[in-house]
Every structure is written in structure tokens, then in C-alpha cells.
């Protein structure tokens, strides 16, 4: 079948709501401020509502046409601020899509296709002298709708959580250890404003991405995850890219980076942005390199600047900028085990060496800030010198760059430009905390955004696991967003299943961090699932899990019958004997007696004894094994 | 095809040596002391030798007949000690294999099959008054062949490791943080003896398991992993059990627990033990429960004792004994979120409640010690009250039991019985270290052996990942052995692929812990693989990884051609541009100049510049995407 049909088929799959789930909304202070949540209805009548990144795609009522894009929820908010202007925008060039000058025919076709693209529209920018960043508003004491949206979203529905956790955890042991984070009991819009004003959180939301459902990245908010997608001349189509996006946010990607290269990247980006409810990040140097035929030393500030404006006009929410790869640092990588492994970093290193000049990105950093604040593009200051192996972790090259990123953070903040800092990479467990400490020390609490880190080098094919270990730890220590790693890392291109595996592994890491930090309510979902498990509500256990489909499929491999979904046993212990059942018997007994359970246990022994004997005829039919 | 044929087919798969690998041996002080290693030959001529748990199965020359079992490497050592006697052994009963008394025909058939079993042989036990535990020898200053074997095995071939690491890591940052462990530069037989004498390590090696290749479990040795296997009346055959064992040790299981239940468990255990080069553990209460028809309250000391002797005679190397589930602790579980989730723990809880009496296992603990020391069966003191959910982690029920296990450890040591302590379970990250600290404090540095722990409850289908995070952390903190969790945990029976997934996840966790602890040489394999990666030696990268098959398959999905196995690029960056290649250019350039790389970088810039320009015609053909 042709590409559109194929896409339609894939989308029909990814648009299916999760089992027993429906979209609900938290109503904000204005009618057009509605924060989506996923409500899971349990078989005992309870409702659990969960943070939802999947956008309108999981709402059956909404008609989706990827050629028209998603509704622009933020447009009224932008209009009301009255500090932006719509303008013609930069003239699109065939080169933006990778067409070569000599390639006349391709250029003509590109142009035709682009002219026809319904998604094209004139961009906005800040009016002369205006600064339209969320940080700028925050510092002027303005609480934007984006900030209120984030506050509602971070809290979720606290009502059901209290049923499990109470207003505060019963015991100290369950309160978590925030490791220096200052997480409030309730996130208020004012708290969000203050965090953004301090630079401790960012809300990536380009004024040319009105489709975005605002979210925050910061140490005092829920830990977020990023998934990378990207086209490939040889392996995928533009339409497949949009489907990859929808697939990624279905499984919980809070942000997506479009790392496309080669042909059609400009158009690919248009389609992704117009159809994305989550912030989109890019690495502009990749496209700039395309424009100079892949010859790093031919890069110029003019070409790079033009690319930043091109992407800012399209609505990219954050740029990875490798401004810390400075000429004086490059020789520090010479005796590394694996040198420079960041593509952006190596591009700039090649440029610096070939010209024996300081990085033009570093030298033009304030010029870049001027572009960022005209569109509210956030900085993701890239770690171009991150370690590519355990042997290179925490070395001078890495930390010299980190200190520079700290200096640049203050420059960006001088312009009220939102900023986060990228981190490694490959780091053994004993060196992970030092990464967080150094980042906090030198980068003034700007959000940290790490790739993994991978705790060992010998797990190709399983690097999503080797890195989930490091990601969970650094997330607990204070990292605000975790960039996922798929099983294909170091080996090849992630396919649809690899993307899902990477995302689920990182949802585990991020949630483990939220629970350890003691984020209010984070553990409520665990309690709800464990309660369902204990009460043999199998469907509820599946439906509350990160991947209900897989949980149910695995269970059904051994016990396919629907009856077993309500049976008070599982395949591990068999029907006649179950450890959880015994505890329930103890508890029921205590309840009958109407006295404290502890007393009942003592007083009731004799009676209990005879009860058990009556059941003595049971024959224990074990079906399988369980640990200890 | 019939079972034997099926087994033969499966075995032929699992007997295939790993790619570019051959079995080699470290020769000990006596001709019959030869420690197996796996030698991987790299394409650059280097040889890397790795710890090998796979036994004779991966040596093509060795003829294997599962009906005859493996060679008894330890028999001469046992004979020389001259402190054991061969005796008739306990009379086998049909009930041992789960045949019911009323089931005459089944009983007859069982008996016939058992009489015919070539694997049956008279057991050994300590001569009257003798104590044959490794701890007993160690405390008398005797270095046994088992101890020397362990020393050679723990060191591995240090020669090749030095090529990467030098005698000591260049920099402090790479030396690891042992978190209180005292890991020597070289493990001597005397060090092993001392660790065993102190009780800080155990060598599980029943005198009736002469086929075992000795290994150590202790905080100052490499972190080990355990895989659980077990039959199931409905899902597998005895022969499949043996194949499961071979499959588990192929992927790196250091120990295997046979958690079989139901029919044929006695015979299954015989076959597993006679064919296992790794220590085998069991939970004897499971079989004892079979013998009383699954009615926990009908258990008696006589039945339990008889089962311990039955299994000790077969050669089981360690018993999980839930002696810490005491009557006074049971009520502490009543208001838990998930009560008692350990099967052994709940069996004993049911017994205590129904009789309103103290646990017969606790009361007869010293009688059990007498059995253990007559066969050198090690204790694995079970945590029957471990938490089954994050909400129950580190509660009083758990820690009350842990303190009791500490008391019992000293009782066991009074009898020179080797002992390790089992740990949880479900524990959020911020509570993991407290588990290790409490265990060290109350259990006198007896080896800790934990199940995970799982850091969150919401990942059914992915609990091998949710628990690998906790396992890696607690392994770093000092846990000696990690019991694996498979993707099927909480949902169903692990199949062949689940077992592999669980083992690889736990090899990652254990290796991450070894690297973080700074175990000498642990990081050498990472360096060798990263060097291969950096030098585009693809086959070496695959062959040094934990799962060469998967690494190669993933790579080949994108670049199947054999040519690309030596190509200086990968699918992530494409043929004309590679970040690692650039670093190599920088390094080569510096080398040519014959001056320090740092100087060369400065001095050589201008020249480098022109060189790069010559290559300017290159067109960058990107094939895919990579993170920033």
C-alpha cells in the first residue's frame, strides 16, 4: 500500500485509547485552558488519573488530519500578550531540504511540493524590542496561561492519590529523599513562575508552536523523558516520521527531538511540529552541515544563523547548541579512550581545528540569544565533549566544557532566555553523583538533561537497560529530563519496537526517581497497582502498568482464560495456595473480630487453627515456581 | 519429536561456543585443578579472557550425556580429606516425587523409573564427629583446592587486563568506590580462606555435588547472579529442566535455584545436580509441603528434617531456610499493603498461626546446623517477610526478621556452617542503602543475597529492568549475589527467552556494581570493547559484549553486508562523516609529528586546515540519526 494508507493504518493503531482509559481534562481559570489527563476506571469502581503525554490522538472524538495539523491551543494566549507580529518570514530555499544546487529537477519538485504544503503559514516573532520568553514574563511577575497549565498538569488529580497516601505519607521512610530538591506539596502557578524566573525550570514553547501542550522541565517537577526520532534517506518516509512521533508520545515521551538529516528535513520538521502536542527539539548544526555539503570546515556563522531563524520560524521549542566545544578544550580529548563521540561536538571540533580559530558559536553566543528571545526558543546547551566510554567519564575535557556551559547559562539568563544543560553519556555508577554536583555547582541550578548515563560499555543490544540504571540514579540526584537510549544504541537505527522499549525503560527510570525524591503523589500509582495485585484484580494490575498490552499478553501466555482474570490465584503459586491469600485470611479474621489486627492475631490463634484444619483436605496443585 | 530428541536439539544449540571464543584453563597447583575461562580472540590479534560459568557444555571436545552426568572433578579432593564416608543413604520413597499414597500405579511406575536411573548413587556424609564445611577447614587454617580454585577464578587472566588498565588505574576517578568492601589487588588462596573463615564469603559446594566448579559469594569478590528454574506439572518436562540449566549458565548464571514443585521433583533434582557445574540451591519447604498434600499446618519437624536429608544426599549446595518467620513477627504484616509475598514465608506464617506456636524451623535451627555441616550445605536464610510493594519496604516486619537472621547467622557460625542472608524485594531507590547498612550491621558481614530489589511497582512485563536498577545499586553497596527477575515476574512462567532476558539484565547490574566498586580488572572488558568500537572493529565489539548474537543481529538489521563489519563508519553517522574518525585524525596527526598531541594540535592547525580543504569535495551522506 502507498505511504498515506500505511500511515493511516499505523495511526489507527496508535490512536486506540489505552484499556479502560478515557481522556479527561482539568479545567483552568479560563475556558480555553484545559489540561488533559488519562482516567483509568478500575473494576472496583475507583478512578485513577494519570499524567498524559499522548495529545488529542488518544481521544476518539477528535478528527485528526496530519495534513492539517493539530488545533492551535495557544494562539489566543499569544494574541492577548500582543507582543508578537506575524511577518512574511525567511524565504524558503530548496537547499533547506537538502537539494543540491546542481540538482535542478529535484529543486523544482521540492519547490512545487513545498508551495502546495497546506501546513505552511507565516511565522510570528517578537515585536521590535520585545522579549517573548516565558522567563521574561516570569521575571516581570507575570503568570502566563502556560505556567498555570504546567501547575495543573504537575499536580494531577490529588483526590485519588490521597486515598492511598493520605495528605502526607504515614511514615518518614515513605517520604522519599529529595536530595536537595525543593518540591512543594501543591504546585501553584506562582511556584511555576518563580521556578522559571530563577532559571530552575523551563517551559519549552516556541511562539510558532501553538499546538504544544505546555510542560515544565525542572528539578522540582516530575522527571521528564525525551525520545529521539529522525528520518533517514534510506530507511523511512516523512509520513512515517509523524507516526513515530505519535507512537513515542503514546508511550510517554514528554519531549521529542527531531534529529533528521539529509533530504526533506525542513518539510519533515514542518509536519512533525504541526502534529506535535509535545515540545520539539533539534540540533541545528546538523542541517547547517547539510547546507555546506557535509564539509564541517565550510560552516559559517551566516549559514548557522540562517538555519536557526529557519527553524525558529517553524516552531522548534529548543535547540541543542554545542557552544562549549571551545578550541582550547579540544586537545584534552586526544588521549581519551574514545575521543569525541558527540556528532555536533565533533563537527565543531573539526571546524575549530581546521581554522585554528575559536568556535563561531561561542563567539556569537549573544547574537544567538537575540534570536532565541524573539521566538522563545530554549537553549539545550550541548555536551559535545561528553564521554563515550567509562574510561573517559568525568575527565577534564568533559568538566571544562561543563564549566563553560555554566558561564553561557548566565549570558543566556542576562537575555531572559530559557536554558537547560546537556549531560553524559557513559558514566560508571560511582561517578554519577559527581556529575550532578558539578552541574549544580557550575550551572546555577539550570535544568540538567542527560543521555543515560550508561553505567557499563559491554551491553550493546541492551544499552536501554545499562543506561536506565544510570538515568534513574541521576534523575533521583536532580536531573530534570532523561534522554532515552534504545536497544539499538551503538548498533543501528531504532525501529518502532526499539523506540517503545527505550521509552518504557526511561519511564521506569523517571518514575523510580520521582518515587525516590518523594514527589507528592508519585507513589500513589504504585500503591494502586500493588493493591490491585494483592486483591487479584488482574485487569486493574494490567491497566495501571506502564504497558498494559504487554502485561496482559505475558499473563495470558500461561493463563489465557478470562476466568483467571478474576481468579484469586496466579500461575506462580497455583489455585489452592497463595501467599497473598493467607495474609488476606489473617486480615479478614481480625476484621471479623472487630478488634485490632494485632490483638486478633494473638487471641484468634486457636479458632484460626480449627478453621485451617477444615480446609486441610485441599490438595496443593502447584503450577510453577516463585523465588523463596 | 520425543523428549530426548528435543533435548538433544536444544542442547546442540546451547553447546555451540560463543563467536571467536574457545575454552582455556588456568592451571592450579595440582594437575586436577584447572579453572575454565573463555578466551575471545580479537581481530587485532589480542586475546581477552572472560569469567566462564558455562561449564563443559561450551567445550566441543567434551562428550555430554545428560543420563550419565558431568565428570566429578572434586571427588579426589573429597577422598584426600578422608573425613567423609559413603553410606546407603535414606530410603527413597515414591512420595519424594509427589506420588500420592492412594496412587498405587503411579507409585509403582515411579519406583521402576527411579531404580533404573543411572544417576542414582550412594551419598557421602561426614564421618561421625567430623565437620566437612569449607568454613570449618578455613577456620582450621586449611586452604582447600576449592579455595585455590576460587582464587584463580576471581583473578582471571590479569595480563591482558593490565594492557588496558595498567597495574593501577591512571586516575583516582577510575579506581571506583568500594563502599567499605576490602578488595585485594590479587586474590590469593589464603585471602579466600580468610574470607570464608570470617564468614564474609561462602563457597557453596555440597560434598555430594562433586561436579561443581567452585565459586565464591562474598562482598570482596565479583558480584554473582542467581537464576531460578523449576518444573511445572503443566508446562515442562524433566529433560527441559536440564536444558534450562544449560541455557541459564551459558548466559552467565553463577548459581541456579531449582524451585520445582509437584510431580517428579526428586528425580528432576537428581538430573539437574548431576548435570550442573554451578551450585544448586533449593527451598526445601516446598517439597515438604508436597509431602503433606499442600496443607501447611500439617507440616512437622520430622517431615522437614527428612526432606533436608533427602536433598543434602542429592547434593544441593544451599538451602533457603525461612527461620526468621517467627510467631511474634507475623502480626506486623497485617496492615501492610501487600502482606506476606514470600511463598516460604507464608507457608510458615500459616503454620505458626494455625498452631499458635513458634516456628519449628526456628526452634530446631541447631538440629538443622547438624545436617548442614555433615554435607556442607550452606544456609541461605530466607526473608519470608520481605516487602512485596514499595509501600511495605523497610518496615518493622522486614527488619525484625533481618535482625533474627543476624542472630541465627551467629548460631550457624558456631557450627562452622556457611551462611548467606536473603534480602528484598520491592524497595524504592532512596531506601536501598538502608537495607545494605542494616544487613551489615546485624548480620556481621555474612554475604547478602537480594531479589532485585524492584524500585517501582508499575512495570509488570518490564520488572527485569525495574529491578536491575535496584540490583546494580545494592550490588555496588555490598550485596554479594543478585537473584534475577525476569520480564514475566508477577505475571507468569518465564520461558527460554525470558530467562535469557533476566540473566542479561542481571549481568549488566552485577558488572555495573563491579565497575563501581573498582574490582581490579572489571573495567578492562569495557575498555577492550570501547577500544574495538572506536577502531571500528565491529566483530570484536559484538564478541566482547554480553550477548554477541543480539549485538550482531541488531547491527545487521541496518547494515547487513559483511563489508560493513570492517567499514570505518556505522549506520548512525554514515560513511563520509564520523565523530570518532575525526578524533582519530587528530590523534594520527599528532603522532606523525612525533610531538605531544596537545602541541601538535596547536602547531598543526594551519597544516591541518589545508589537509581538510583537500577533502572538501566529500559529500556528507547521512544515513541516520544520533543524539546531539
From Swiss-Prot, chains A, B:
It catalyses: 5-amino-1-(5-phospho-beta-D-ribosyl)imidazole + S-adenosyl-L-methionine = 4-amino-2-methyl-5-(phosphooxymethyl)pyrimidine + CO + 5'-deoxyadenosine + formate + L-methionine + 3 H(+). [4Fe-4S] cluster binds at residues 570, 573, 578. It comes from the Bacteria. Substrate binds at residues 228, 257, 286, 322, 342-344, 383-386, 422, 449. One of its GO terms (molecular function) is carbon-carbon lyase activity. One of its GO terms (cellular component) is cytosol. This is Phosphomethylpyrimidine synthase. It comes from Methylibium petroleiphilum (strain ATCC BAA-1232 / LMG 22953 / PM1). The lineage of its organism: Bacteria, Pseudomonadati, Pseudomonadota, Betaproteobacteria, Burkholderiales. The gene is thiC.
Amino acid at each position: 500500500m502507498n505511504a498515506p494508507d500505511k500511515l493511516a493504518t499505523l495511526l489507527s493503531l496508535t490512536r486506540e485509547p489505552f484499556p479502560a482509559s478515557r481522556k479527561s481534562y482539568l479545567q483552568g481559570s479560563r475556558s480555553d485552558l484545559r489540561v488533559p489527563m488519562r482516567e483509568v476506571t478500575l473494576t472496583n469502581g475507583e478512578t485513577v488519573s494519570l499524567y498524559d503525554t499522548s495529545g488529542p490522538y488518544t481521544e476518539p472524538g477528535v478528527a485528526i488530519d496530519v495534513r492539517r495539523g493539530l488545533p492551535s491551543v495557544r494562539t489566543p494566549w499569544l494574541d492577548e500578550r500582543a507582543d508578537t507580529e506575524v511577518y512574511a518570514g525567511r524565504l524558503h530555499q530548496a537547499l533547506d531540504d537538502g537539494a543540491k544546487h546542481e540538482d535542478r529537477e529535484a529543486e523544482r519538485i521540492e519547490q512545487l511540493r513545498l508551495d502546495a504544503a497546506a501546513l505552511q503559514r507565516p511565522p510570528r516573532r517578537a515585536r521590535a524590542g520585545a522579549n517573548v520568553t516565558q522567563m521574561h514574563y516570569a521575571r516581570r511577575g507575570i503568570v502566563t496561561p502556560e505556567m498555570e497549565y504546567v501547575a495543573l498538569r504537575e499536580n494531577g488529580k490529588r483526590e485519588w492519590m490521597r486515598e492511598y497516601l493520605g495528605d502526607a505519607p504515614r511514615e518518614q521512610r515513605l517520604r522519599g529523599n529529595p536530595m536537595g530538591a525543593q518540591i512543594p506539596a501543591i504546585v501553584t502557578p506562582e511556584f511555576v513562575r518563580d521556578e522559571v524566573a530563577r532559571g530552575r525550570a523551563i517551559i519549552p514553547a516556541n511562539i510558532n508552536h501553538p499546538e504544544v501542550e505546555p510542560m515544565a522541565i525542572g528539578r522540582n517537577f516530575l522527571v521528564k523523558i525525551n525520545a529521539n526520532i529522525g528520518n533517514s534517506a534510506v530507511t523511512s518516509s516523512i509520513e512515517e516520521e509523524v507516526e513515530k512521533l505519535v507512537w513515542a508520545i503514546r508511550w510517554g515521551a514528554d519531549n521529542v527531538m527531531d534529529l533528521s538529516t539529509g533530504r526533506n528535513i525542513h518539510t519533515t520538521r514542518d509536519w512533525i511540529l504541526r502534529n506535535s502536542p509535545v515540545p520539539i527539539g533539534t540540533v541545528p548544526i546538523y542541517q547547517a552541515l547539510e547546507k555546506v555539503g557535509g564539509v564541517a570546515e565550510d560552516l559559517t556563522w551566516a549559514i548557522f544563523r540562517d538555519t536557526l531563524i529557519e527553524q525558529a520560524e517553524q516552531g522548534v521549542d529548543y535547540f541543542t547548541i554545542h557552544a562549549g566545544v571551545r578550541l582550547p578544550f579540544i586537545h584534552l580529548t586526544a588521549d581519551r579512550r574514545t575521543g569525541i563521540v558527540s556528532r555536533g561536538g565533533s563537527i565543531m571540533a573539526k571546524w575549530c581545528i581546521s581554522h585554528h580559530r575559536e568556535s563561531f558559536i561561542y563567539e556569537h553566543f549573544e547574537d544567538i540569544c537575540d534570536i532565541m528571545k524573539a521566538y522563545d526558543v530554549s537553549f539545550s546547551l550541548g555536551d559535545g565533549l561528553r564521554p563515550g566510554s567509562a574510561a573517559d567519564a568525568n575527565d577534564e575535557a568533559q568538566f571544562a566544557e561543563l564549566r563553560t556551559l555554566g558561564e553561557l547559562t548566565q549570558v543566556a539568563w542576562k537575555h531572559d532566555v530559557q536554558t537547560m544543560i546537556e549531560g553524559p553519556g557513559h558514566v560508571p555508577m560511582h561517578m554519577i553523583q559527581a556529575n550532578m554536583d558539578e552541574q549544580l555547582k557550575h550551572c546555577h541550578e539550570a535544568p540538567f538533561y542527560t543521555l543515560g548515563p550508561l553505567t557499563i560499555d559491554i551491553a550493546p543490544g541492551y544499552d536501554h537497560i545499562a543506561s536506565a540504571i544510570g538515568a534513574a540514579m541521576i534523575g533521583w540526584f536532580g536531573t530534570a529530563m532523561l534522554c532515552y537510549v534504545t536497544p539499538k544504541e551503538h548498533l543501528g537505527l531504532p525501529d518502532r519496537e526499539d523506540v517503545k522499549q527505550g521509552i518504557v525503560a526511561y519511564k521506569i527510570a523517571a518514575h523510580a526517581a520521582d518515587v525516590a525524591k518523594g514527589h507528592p503523589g508519585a507513589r500513589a500509582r504504585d500503591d494502586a497497582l500493588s493493591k490491585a495485585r494483592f486483591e487479584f484484580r488482574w485487569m486493574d494490575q494490567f491497566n495501571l502498568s506502564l504497558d498494559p498490552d504487554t502485561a496482559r499478553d505475558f499473563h495470558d501466555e500461561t493463563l489465557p482464560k478470562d476466568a483467571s482474570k478474576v481468579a484469586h490465584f496466579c500461575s506462580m503459586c497455583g489455585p489452592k495456595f497463595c501467599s497473598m491469600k493467607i495474609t488476606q485470611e489473617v486480615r479478614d479474621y481480625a476484621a471479623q473480630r472487630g478488634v485490632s489486627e494485632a490483638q486478633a492475631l494473638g487471641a484468634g490463634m486457636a479458632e484460626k487453627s480449627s478453621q485451617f484444619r477444615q480446609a486441610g483436605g485441599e490438595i496443593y496443585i502447584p503450577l510453577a515456581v516463585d523465588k523463596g
